[in-house]
Amino acid sequence: MAKLGKRLKKAVSTVDRDKFYALDEAVKTVRSNATAKFDETVEIAMNLGIDPRHADQMVRGMVQLPNGTGKTVRVAVFARAGKADEALAAGADIVGAEDLADKIQAGEFNFDRCIATPDMMGVVGRLGKILGPRGLMPNPKLGTVTPNVAEAVKAAKGGAVEFRAEKTGIVHAGVGKASFSEQALEENIRAFVSAINRAKPSGAKGTYIEKVSLSSTMGPGIKLDIPALVASLGG
């Protein structure tokens, strides 16, 4: 622990807590501070001016990161017959119907994302109390209830990131690994922030994006210059 404390202390000393960093400088600093013995995840935290307790102020969605997350995602698919074959061909790790539901009810959760064809929702619906709290319940708004299972599996495997605002109005997500190039991380971050911008709810009043910070798994947070970041998104 002393070793970890010394490393973190050194990393903190490289960050100006009163400064709002340009994206490129923030990414460079985060990468240089990611000195753990594993490939740290680069994480973004966005404080939004919303109250998610109100239905018209909820922020939730899915975004495809152009350079993936660097994480191996295990995908389970509820499908039958030809759709099950399509899911397997697309790279799904687990495919099933009632048999898959039985495994989940028995406590088997060896997957990170769950997809279902619409006709399977009668089976999946019964698992709501199990899958819901774990953030695994298929949802048509997120593209995880769909007849296009192959496309959904490829998206999940290729860097699709689900986001949802917490009760405090904060959205967290991993946007890549410290081993990614600076350009790859910047592209992923811009894609994520753009998705949050597009997901601005009708009930949001005043300043929408209040604070954005970037960090690695074991590193200190770095505040981003929001006006410059938003201006860099284009379109």
UniProtKB/Swiss-Prot annotation:
One of its GO terms (biological process) is regulation of translation. It comes from the Bacteria. Disulfide bonds: none annotated. GO terms for molecular function: rRNA binding; structural constituent of ribosome; tRNA binding. One of its GO terms (cellular component) is cytosolic large ribosomal subunit. Keywords: Repressor, Ribonucleoprotein, Ribosomal protein, RNA-binding, rRNA-binding, Translation regulation, tRNA-binding. Belongs to the universal ribosomal protein uL1 family. Binds directly to 23S rRNA. The L1 stalk is quite mobile in the ribosome, and is involved in E site tRNA release. Part of the 50S ribosomal subunit. This is Large ribosomal subunit protein uL1. It comes from Rhodospirillum centenum (strain ATCC 51521 / SW).
